[in-house]
């Protein structure tokens, strides 16, 4: 019985709003104004540190796993484009890099910054003139895991821009997105 009452109350609220009888309705052509401003803001990158055993393990993971990856090995498939009609190597760089940016955000250092700078610089160097960054040859674009991999490239580039404000990464991400839209088309 209670779910039925809640459902009816919800339908009544929707009907009242649709009829314009709600006092909280904002006319369609007028922007809504904020009555209450956000009081909660995220802490700046690097401002929160975890201590103790867990903090030590996090630091070890960041230093010895995330920042110790072989960048050349992660970027090489973007140069060689070996995936053809099968493969999903294009996701590896983006997944690793997004995690590396989280690690850098948690424990920013000059050494970590050099690692992520090098990784993004080397990946962006593989961008073709039309904007594509991926591991598939031209004849296999949009096939198999190509779009999936491009998504991870975009996430990595945007994570880098979010923390560093380096516009080259944002521009590379825009070109990747524009290329995908041009290939896949609207809709």
What residue spans do the PLM features occupy?
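Positively charged n-region of N-terminal signal peptides that target proteins for export
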Residues: 1-4
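Bacterial N-terminal signal peptides
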Residues: 7-15
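Low-complexity, Ser/Thr/Pro/Gly-enriched N-terminal "stalk/linker" regions
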Residues: 20-92, 110-135
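Well-ordered alpha-helical scaffold segments within catalytic/enzyme domains
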Residues: 48, 52-56, 95-110, 152-167
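Aromatic- and histidine-enriched alpha-helix N-cap/loop-to-helix transition segments
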Residues: 84-98, 111-114, 118, 144-155, ...
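A conserved hydrophobic secondary-structure block that centers on an alpha-helix together
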Residues: 137-187
